[in-house]
Amino acid sequence: MIKTIIFDLGGVLLDIDLPYCIQRVKELGVDIDALSAIPAPELAIDTKPAVMGEGMVASGMLHLYQVGGISTADFIKTIQRLCRPGISYEQVLEAWNTCCIDIPQRRLDNVLALRQRGYRIYMLSNTNDAHWQDIKNRCFGGQDMVDKYFDNVFLSQEMQLAKPNDDIFLKVIEFLSVQPEECLFIDDSTANVEAASYLGFHTIHADVSTTKNGKVIALPNVDWMDEIEEILTQNATSQS
């Protein structure tokens, strides 16, 4: 019986615009290929590239930041060194955070409604400290509001692992003391959904993006509740 529902953040709850973020960073004079090519030091952390969004992965220094291997200050300063002269730390940080748009309230209302029905609700996200601080404070209004919606939050930067690495899913279910078949996982990445499904999770691929002015963004009026309710109903029926 499904008792636990695990949501991805970006592209599922949070509307994101990675192409716009890349554009803004380029406007600072950064060669994106050069940034992506910066190698990461050898550390005892996950080395499998993290999925940032459908079709986009973080490698090298970008991946290192996603899994908490480098501080925000060091990461932003690394980008700043690639900018044209005169670009400030604050300008780089602002450009980096432009991929995080907003979380429509209806999605949060639905998350809360599921929690009030007795489901344990969690977030599992490939994210970094700068993005999480921005999202937590601007979209949620602080940690207390995050706690209102979720029983716990699992972040790649804190776990030093990233989806689709099997180990991050295994660590989550070990921490929660649940079996994969008791969990429903919702993510916008094919690779992440396939990894979870292979381990036995019930899954939903939240693949409802659209292109607007050359940018791929999640539709703000979509919340995947029909798909969630269908799987929950089917699962309950099969267990009765």
Mark where each language-model region is.
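Active-site neighborhood of HAD-like aspartate-dependent phosphohydrolases
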Residues: 1-52, 198-199, 209
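Generic structural signal for small/hydrophobic residues in well-ordered secondary structure
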Residues: 8-11, 68, 114, 123, ...
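Short amphipathic alpha-helical segments and helix-helix/interface helices
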Residues: 22, 108-112, 123, 169, ...
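Substrate-recognition element of Asp-dependent hydrolases with the DxDx(T/V) motif
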Residues: 89-139
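Helical cap/lid subdomains and adjacent loops of hydrolase enzymes that gate the active-site channel
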Residues: 24-25, 38-40, 45, 60-64, ...
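Helix N-cap/coil-helix junction residues
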Residues: 30, 85, 177-178
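Asp-based, Mg2+/Mn2+-dependent phosphohydrolase catalytic module
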Residues: 1-7, 128-129, 134-240
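A metal-dependent, Asp-based hydrolase signature
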Residues: 50-93
